[in-house]
């Protein structure tokens, strides 16, 4: 079950609307509310991270739907958030058990955001792929996590998983690109 520290994600009329939106996004994430996360995204959103380098539109929301559906013990902590007219930033931590190996993962992530029409139109998350692979995949990840072929394999497997999820997800829970 996801953990939410209500004091950790406060929004306020005194905050810039973009900072409030970032906090709303991560509060939904911590509640395991993929629909709430997707509502923060512009229909033309572009998402990227080391595992999903190019997701457009509904693919981004479906990626979160898939990840939340698979993460039985996810805890999300928003460590920092800021936003203004030029963009936004967040530092957050995900703690979960990697389902394919049963290994615990603590992933420290930095997010950059751009906005259009009061919604997130660009979302780029960055984290150490080697550190993630070392935790998620164990000794193999530690030994090979810095090599491009492992990253390509993880990306391919993730893309295939998302394609399968999108093919099987009910239409009312998917937004098309």
Give short role names for the model-derived ranges:
Residues 2-35, 39, 43, 155-177:
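Short, low-complexity N-terminal intrinsically disordered segments enriched in polar/charged residues
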Residues 25-29, 41, 47, 52, ...:
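Aromatic side chains
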Residues 22-25, 37-38, 45, 60, ...:
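Hydrophobic pocket/interface hotspot
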Residues 7, 19, 42-49, 60-63, ...:
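Generic, low-specificity signal for short hydrophobic/alpha-helical stretches with a mild N-terminal bias
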Residues 34-38, 42-88:
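A solvent-exposed, acidic/Ser-Thr-rich amphipathic alpha-helical stretch
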Residues 17, 59, 105:
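Soluble or luminal CAZymes and related metallo-dependent hydrolases
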Residues 9-12, 68-177:
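A beta-strand edge to alpha-helix "cap/lid" segment located at domain peripheries
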